[in-house]
Amino acid sequence: MASPNPAQSTTILFRRLTWQSAVTISIRLADGEPGAGNACDRYYIKAPRYSYLPLFIPEIRENLVELALDDAQLEQIDEKNWWFEEEVSEEDKQRFVRQGACRWHWPIDLVDIHSFISRPQPLPSSIELSSTPRVISLLLHLSNPPQDRLLMPNSIEVCKSQWLNQVKEADFVRWRNTNRVTNLRRVDLEAGWDGIVNNDFDLYAQMVNKIVPLPLLTSSNSTQPSRPSSADPSGPPRAPDSSYATRAIPFKIYLPDNAPVIQEIVPPISESGKPTTLLAVLQVHLPLLFPISSENPYELAFPIAQGILIPQEAEVAWIASCLCGVDGWVRVGVCLSAA
């Protein structure tokens, strides 16, 4: 029996820990909606970071809306018109622009990123962002959805389609093709989404272990991607893909004040032949916030991903293997440091 690959075992451990990360969300019926202001107008959920808001609509309807509204009011509402936005306090209104309406295809982690970076925060003293659990406060609207902001309906099938599109796009960024996704057996591809819906990591891993490469750094690693996996199941076994050998890392940087998302080519290996670190990426694309000359690179701002502070020496290839979202993308939020 072949001995287990230490890199694979460690990667699976970190992927499972990332999978288990969750966000506490407080959901309140928006002012002016039927049932708002009564004793049953708020509901709390513990939402996995990898999940999506449309998956929680049945639970929210049963445990919030059906308790807050009477039968006549329930007959007048349509779930297709529901939408969420982050609740903003009077103090926060004086700060950066908030995320507003939450898009249906955003993973919960991205909703949390936008919420966290919307105001300057003190630099965490450890990898924990806060000593007390954070709660995202969302308002539930039952009508008049802002279609120009939401972009798509809250259908689970539409959400699944958008997730799959992101999976393919991430694969293309890595290898300049989508062969690893398109060559998957249908049962493995469906297992990825079913794992998300059913909160089953092992089911999800049935897909992700076949398309997201391991952080294998060897002397043979280069910036040139390896050949795509063969579609012939009878072919000879192929060495595991390395995230250090990909063309680029599926990588997005989110900024406060609803600034445009930064999505550039991020190679796993720098021109000097050394692994690309997160700090190096930030210094290239945000030099004013992360100046090269600074003794404390996180003095003005700091990066977060999956709810934790990311160390400056973290290699982006490792992050892409162990801390990426369920669609394969690394999402880093940049938060300004509080004075």
Swiss-Prot record:
Posttranslational modification: Conjugated to ATG12; which is essential for autophagy.
Compartment(s) = Preautophagosomal structure membrane
Q: Which UniProt keywords apply?
A: Autophagy, Isopeptide bond, Membrane, Protein transport, Transport, Ubl conjugation
How does the protein's chain sit in the membrane according to the entry? Peripheral membrane protein
In terms of InterPro entries, this protein maps to:
Atg5, ATG5_HBR, Atg5_HR, ATG5_UblA, Atg5_UblA_dom_sf, ATG5_UblB
- Cross-link Glycyl lysine isopeptide (Lys-Gly) (interchain with G-Cter in ATG12) lies at 168
For whether the record's keyword set contains Membrane, the answer is yes
Q: Which Gene3D superfamilies match?
A: 3.10.20.620, Autophagy protein Apg5, helix rich domain (1.10.246.190), Phosphatidylinositol 3-kinase Catalytic Subunit, Chain A, domain 1 (3.10.20.90)
Query: Might you name a Gene Ontology BP term for this protein?
Result: aggrephagy
User: What biological function has been recorded for the protein in this entry?
Assistant: Involved in cytoplasm to vacuole transport (Cvt) and autophagic vesicle formation. Autophagy is essential for maintenance of amino acid levels and protein synthesis under nitrogen starvation. Required for selective autophagic degradation of the nucleus (nucleophagy). Also required for mitophagy, which eliminates defective or superfluous mitochondria in order to fulfill cellular energy requirements and prevent excess ROS production.
Subunit structure, as described in the record:
Conjugated with ATG12.
Q: What is this protein called?
A: Autophagy protein 5
Species of origin reads Cryptococcus neoformans var. neoformans serotype D (strain JEC21 / ATCC MYA-565) (Filobasidiella neoformans)
